[in-house]
């Protein structure tokens, strides 16, 4: 009887190890969710970008954090989470609802919340496999500083419609870069 239990236990441990070693694979549906967020951000455009040319600014999008070749998959998940979280916080800011259609904002927030839930589950899974937090401090700090610059810009411009348009376009750029990063890792899998 003992050898049968030993065999079952060994098979269970091997199958768990095989499943756990797969790591976090963001499903194709998550990629579609990213595209949905980009589509919603595009639909939010209310001001012609050409009328806001004088308001444009270089916010120094952290390309190394969003697409650097040195970024490992686990760290990329952390960066994707950071970008999504800051985007969600930015579009939950008080006092800008008058600029955009509230129903579109609700859809955007819901899509971002779903992505955060997916990414948090992924982070927990990856951290469980590695036993340590995944955050690469340089990348995380670069993303936080980038979104801080966007927030300061909005305050400086008093949340004007043109300022929000510039920020909306900039967030689309950041989100597009994070989507490209995610898809590059998905192709490698």
UniProtKB/Swiss-Prot annotation:
Protein location: Secreted
Disulphide linkage map: 24-122, 52-162
Entry keyword Disulfide bond: yes
UniProt KW Transferase keyword: no
GO molecular function list: cytokine activity; type I interferon receptor binding
SMART domains: IFabd
GO CC annotations on file: extracellular space
Listed Pfam families: Interferon
UniProt xrefs under InterPro entries: 4_helix_cytokine-like_core, Interferon_alpha/beta/delta
First-listed, main subcellular location of the protein, grouped into a coarse class: secreted
Family membership noted in the UniProt record: Belongs to the alpha/beta interferon family.
Function per UniProt: Produced by macrophages, IFN-alpha have antiviral activities. Interferon stimulates the production of two enzymes: a protein kinase and an oligoadenylate synthetase.
Protein name: Interferon alpha-F
